[in-house]
């Protein structure tokens, strides 16, 4: 989770919502990393999507069987669908997302028995730290009066 938080901090520094994600293989080696990059003009550039794509390139296969996704915020429906399609084995996320979370909050796509793949889910891991990171980002965003992009770490 430390690497996911570091990526989330990087996202915030770039003016993105602070979400970071990593994909680790069976041995715990990180094979994919991602941070939000939507403000670069790509609505699909969620941290999870980028980490999945990098992991698939790293192993040369779209099937990420035996891997674990660690992300600072509960994935949305799009990212949850990508996790299912990539056959990720386990999902660990920080804060629950009451507005878009689709791994237990608004729905549970990653454990839907109608789908061809389901995964183990651990939600609320380091939840307070995840929530505080997001709250700090949005507080600073609201405080900006001159339009300058600013992020103050930790």
PLM feature segments, named:
Residues 1-11, 78, 82-154:
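Zinc-dependent deaminase
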Residues 61-74:
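Immediate flanking context of iron-sulfur cluster ligation sites
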Residues 15-19, 65:
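Short, basic and Ser/Thr-rich N-terminal targeting/leader segments
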Residues 40-50:
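A short, polar/charged loop-to-alpha-helix boundary motif
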Residues 19-28:
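Short beta-strand scaffold segments in enzyme catalytic cores
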């Amino acid at each position: 989770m430390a690497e996911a938080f570091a990526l989330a901090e990087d996202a915030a520094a770039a003016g993105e919502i602070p979400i970071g994600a990593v994909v680790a293989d069976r041995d715990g080696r990180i094979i994919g990393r991602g941070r939000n990059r939507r403000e670069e003009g790509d609505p699909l550039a969620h941290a999870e999507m980028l980490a999945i794509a990098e992991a698939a390139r790293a192993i040369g296969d779209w099937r990420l069987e035996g891997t674990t996704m660690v992300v600072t915020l509960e994935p949305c429906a799009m990212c949850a669908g990508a996790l299912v399609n990539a056959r990720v084995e386990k999902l660990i996320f920080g804060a629950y997302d009451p507005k878009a979370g689709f791994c237990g909050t608004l729905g549970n796509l990653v454990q839907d028995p109608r789908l061809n793949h389901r995964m183990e889910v651990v939600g609320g891991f380091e939840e307070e730290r995840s929530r505080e990171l997001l709250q700090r980002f949005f507080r600073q965003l609201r405080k900006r009066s001159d339009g300058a992009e600013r992020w103050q770490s930790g």
